[in-house]
């Protein structure tokens, strides 16, 4: 049988309190919890999945970034507008892509861009 890669599920630093991070990602960013055990949890939204890991090492979070393509970028920007996070402007970049950045309370940076 030929080897075929499936999906990628990045490990996402959650900060020192996993429950606070879960609350942010579930109630704020619209993910759903798939599982939780000990210092880890799995979250998912529309096929995009992460494994949250409780950690106290801020440099990991400050150096973690993820780029996620979405349909409905304008609506997502409005949805995330009231989050307790740093939200950058929604803008067209010089390379021709509309996007915005969000920095979660843990320090993780998300770049969201319009698909198509």
Which residues does each predicted region cover?
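Conserved short beta-strand elements that form part of the metal-binding/catalytic scaffold
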Residues: 32-64, 109-114
């Amino acid at each position: 049988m030929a080897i075929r890669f499936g999906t990628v599920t990045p490990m996402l630093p959650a900060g020192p309190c996993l429950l606070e991070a879960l609350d942010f990602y579930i109630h704020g960013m619209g993910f759903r919890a798939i599982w939780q055990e000990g210092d880890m949890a799995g979250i998912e939204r529309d096929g995009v999945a992460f494994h949250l890991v409780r950690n106290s090492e801020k440099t990991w979070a400050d150096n973690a970034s993820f780029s996620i393509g979405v349909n409905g970028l304008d609506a997502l920007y409005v949805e995330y507008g009231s989050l307790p996070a740093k939200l950058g402007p929604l803008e067209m970049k010089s390379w021709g892509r509309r996007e915005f950045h969000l920095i979660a309370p843990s320090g993780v940076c998300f770049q969201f861009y319009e698909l198509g």
